[in-house]
């Protein structure tokens, strides 16, 4: 997670769903306003035993990373999700990407975009997209 106040607040808003079994969290100053290649470098350093990885960062870097990783959609639904990301990637959007390789081999176009969720897609959300 970026060390910024906003990303910490985002994490606090999400972390309750894990209850007492919260995942390990690392705050990294390097994620603050990082460009997508720097974010990809962080992904590549994840330990191999890591099954899931969540980055909470800032636009434009986090948005550009999602685009770079999902660059080659393989199915019509994935293409539709990529088009939705291209139309608008608002603050607090979530891109879920699947990757079958070793983290150290993570590369642009190697991931599948399995979900793209904007805040307004969540039932009960009454705010505005940034």
Q: Language-model segments: which ranges?
A:
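A glycine-rich beta-strand to alpha-helix segment
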Residues: 50-72
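Short, well-ordered, mixed-charge alpha-helical segments that flank or form enzyme active sites
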Residues: 63-64, 105-106, 122-123
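Residues that form or immediately flank small-molecule/cofactor binding pockets and catalytic motifs
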Residues: 30-32, 118-121
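Domain-level recognition of soluble alpha/beta enzyme cores
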Residues: 70-112, 116-119
